[in-house]
């Protein structure tokens, strides 16, 4: 019988020098296969005297176990090395700057509407909405707008037919809200409105917020106080405000509200007034018992003032270079 120590030494050397799983498997076959050296040693036990077979068999099995253990250890090492090499090829350098996912941002007009809603919401005003295609009653008649008023012409209004049009203001929401409820009322109505006009300070579609408060003993001083607080809050500074007498069919008395700019000039920002008794009557409210005030403002005008934008049309041209300034 060949000396087992020599076989183990040769097998160990072959195992340690195997540089791949294929080479290692060849070593396994060489020593443990059907015709492997250790297998032949086991088969030769029959040639030994009976008294030597037991001891020789134990030695051969011990040698076989040692070779199997060495092969298993080498196989594990080769598999780890192979995996590490594969991972090295596929590795991601986490120190490299990644591709940033660009976050979107709110449109400046949306920001302004939300700011207005937040202020009046804190005063208990709800937010109401209504259809953008309006009928003549809600857009004109119920608001005390005379039949010969210029707003009823094609020059100012987009008509579908004599009784249906794109709303020219959100005042129709005020009428619908009062029709469907009972006083007191305290709400604002933001939304898109449409007028046949287009230049540096006007677009055919723009955004408006109108507000209304109807209750007993409502007066103009309350209106002035709320609007003065709103403008100071909106511009985040104490601004000088003035109320100029004006005329609107749906309010009496009526006023236009100006703020004083840093250059000393006055700029109109909104209109307001006490709700006309005829408007209250049109929705079945007794003007002898209830009074109210209303106000309306162009959102784009306020947005232009807040962010220093000179051309209203820039809000609707979808120029990312412009819009990214407000993120």
UniProtKB/Swiss-Prot annotation:
What UniProt keywords are attached to this protein's entry? Aminoacyl-tRNA synthetase, ATP-binding, Cytoplasm, Ligase, Magnesium, Metal-binding, Nucleotide-binding, Protein biosynthesis
Q: Name one Pfam family in it.
A: tRNA-synt_2d
The record lists the catalysed reaction(s) as: tRNA(Phe) + L-phenylalanine + ATP = L-phenylalanyl-tRNA(Phe) + AMP + diphosphate + H(+)
What's the record's note on cofactor binding? Binds 2 magnesium ions per tetramer.
> EC top class, in one word?
ligase
Where Mg(2+) binds, per the record, is at: 252
GO BP annotations of the record are: phenylalanyl-tRNA aminoacylation
Query: Which InterPro entries would you find in this protein's record?
Result: aa-tRNA-synth_II, aa-tRNA-synth_II/BPL/LPL, Phe-tRNA-synth_IIc_asu, Phe-tRNA_ligase_II_N, Phe_tRNA_ligase_alpha1_bac, Phenylalanyl-tRNA_Synthase, tRNA-bd_arm
Could you identify this protein by its name?
Phenylalanine--tRNA ligase alpha subunit
Q: From which source organism is this entry?
A: Vibrio atlanticus (strain LGP32) (Vibrio splendidus (strain Mel32))
Upper taxonomic classification of the species? Answer: Bacteria, Pseudomonadati, Pseudomonadota, Gammaproteobacteria, Vibrionales
């Amino acid at each position: 019988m060949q000396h087992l120590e020599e076989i183990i030494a040769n097998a160990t050397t072959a195992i340690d020098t195997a540089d791949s799983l294929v080479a290692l498997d060849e070593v396994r076959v060489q020593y443990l296969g059907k015709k492997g050296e250790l297998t032949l040693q086991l088969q030769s036990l029959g040639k030994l005297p009976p008294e030597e077979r037991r001891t020789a068999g134990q030695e051969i099995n011990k040698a076989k176990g040692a070779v199997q253990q060495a092969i298993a250890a080498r196989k594990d090492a080769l598999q780890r090395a192979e995996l590490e090499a594969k991972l090295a090829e596929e590795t991601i350098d986490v120190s490299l700057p990644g591709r940033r996912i660009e976050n979107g941002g709110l449109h400046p007009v949306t920001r302004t509407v939300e700011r207005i809603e937040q202020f009046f919401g804190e005063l208990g005003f709800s937010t109401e909405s209504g259809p953008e295609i309006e009928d003549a009653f809600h857009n004109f008649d119920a608001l005390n707008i005379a039949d010969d008023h210029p707003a009823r012409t094609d020059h100012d209004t987009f008509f579908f037919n004599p009784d249906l049009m794109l709303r020219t203001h959100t005042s129709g929401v005020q009428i619908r809200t009062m029709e469907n409820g009972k006083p007191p009322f305290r709400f604002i109505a933001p939304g898109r409105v449409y007028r046949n006009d287009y230049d540096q300070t006007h677009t055919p579609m723009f955004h408006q917020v109108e507000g209304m408060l109807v209750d007993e003993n409502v007066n103009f001083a309350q209106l002035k106080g709320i609007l003065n607080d709103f403008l100071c809050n909106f511009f985040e500074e104490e601004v000088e405000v003035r109320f100029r007498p004006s005329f609107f069919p749906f309010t009496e008395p009526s006023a236009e509200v100006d703020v004083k700019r840093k250059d000393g000039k006055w700029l109109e920002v909104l209109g307001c007034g006490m709700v006309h008794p005829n408007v209250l009557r049109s929705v079945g409210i007794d003007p002898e018992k209830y009074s109210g005030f209303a106000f309306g403002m162009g959102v784009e005008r306020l947005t232009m003032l807040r962010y220093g934008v000179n051309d209203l049309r820039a809000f609707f041209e979808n120029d990312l270079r412009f819009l990214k300034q407000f993120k």
